Amino acid sequence: MNKKTRIAITGPIGRMGRMLIKEIQNNKHSHLTVAVVQKKHQLIGQDIGRIIGIGEIGVLISDELNIKKNDFDVLIDFTRPAGTLEYLKYCNKFKKNIVIGTTGFSKEEIDIIKSYSQKIAIIIASNFSIGINLLFQLIKKTTQIIGKDSDINILEYHHRNKIDAPSGTALEIGEVISKVMNWNLNQDSIYYQKGITGIRDAKKIGFSIVRAGNIVGKHTVMFSSCDEEIKITHTASNRMSFARGAIQSALWIHKKNTGLFDMTDVLSL
């Protein structure tokens, strides 16, 4: 009988943290053993299951990851860049693998993550949904066929509380397109604003961003020529698809030694 993968969750009280815990509890191959919050959080010592409304599960909220080093196999982190880098230090010190869903990293921070992947195994993804990762493949193929003849625009929609823009997923879509077209995403992007913007440059990716209400996530990529237009859209109805993908990633990376991976590795795309 295979042992369950023991998982630690950071930010367990947030929306994504709650979804992750519920999915872990429903997955026969995983087991929640650690729930980590910031120092001096008012809920430290309380049962996380009771706090998120699923009843007591025997896991007490803690702010001390180091004393829990023998209690988990993989850490899942959906917090903020500064917090993620601190958790990476712990994982590196105790040789624990990590799944990172945090977005908004700078190039320098990504380089730090890459350096840690020489010592532990890391999965980092802007979006853990199976659907969005299939979308990446569709975008790649479409760009290969009609990219040079199209104006390409990415439209992304998220809830009003999302703090980074464009979304990590939108930027990853942009990277997929840029690699095919041999463009530099940082230099070849348009972020629409008011005023006289001039004629649209054909060799650019346009980004449009909406923050409103409780939108979980919607991404549309438009390929527009003078004769026709193709739209490819992915809409997330809830966050459970992200949670399932993150748990699947944790199970996949459990026995890995070192390396930097993403969802294309997990899904064998």
UniProtKB/Swiss-Prot annotation:
InterPro entries: DapB_C (IPR022663), DapB_N (IPR000846), DapB_N_CS (IPR022664), DHDPR_bac (IPR023940), NAD(P)-bd_dom_sf (IPR036291). Pathway: Amino-acid biosynthesis; L-lysine biosynthesis via DAP pathway; (S)-tetrahydrodipicolinate from L-aspartate: step 4/4. NADP(+) binds at K39. NAD(+) binds at G11, P12, I13, G14, R15, M16, G101, T102, T103, A125, S126, N127, F128. The keyword NAD applies. One of its GO terms (cellular component) is cytosol. Transmembrane segments: none annotated. (S)-2,3,4,5-tetrahydrodipicolinate binds at H159, G168, T169. One of its GO terms (molecular function) is oxidoreductase activity, acting on CH or CH2 groups, NAD or NADP as acceptor. Its main location: cytoplasm. It is found in: Cytoplasm. The active site is at H158, K162. Its EC number is 1.17.1.8. It catalyses: (S)-2,3,4,5-tetrahydrodipicolinate + NAD(+) + H2O = (2S,4S)-4-hydroxy-2,3,4,5-tetrahydrodipicolinate + NADH + H(+); (S)-2,3,4,5-tetrahydrodipicolinate + NADP(+) + H2O = (2S,4S)-4-hydroxy-2,3,4,5-tetrahydrodipicolinate + NADPH + H(+). The keyword Cytoplasm applies. Keywords: Amino-acid biosynthesis, Cytoplasm, Diaminopimelate biosynthesis, Lysine biosynthesis, NAD, NADP, Oxidoreductase. GO terms for biological process: diaminopimelate biosynthetic process; lysine biosynthetic process via diaminopimelate. Belongs to the DapB family. Catalyzes the conversion of 4-hydroxy-tetrahydrodipicolinate (HTPA) to tetrahydrodipicolinate. Homotetramer. This is 4-hydroxy-tetrahydrodipicolinate reductase. It comes from Buchnera aphidicola subsp. Acyrthosiphon pisum (strain 5A). The lineage of its organism: Bacteria, Pseudomonadati, Pseudomonadota, Gammaproteobacteria, Enterobacterales. The gene is dapB.
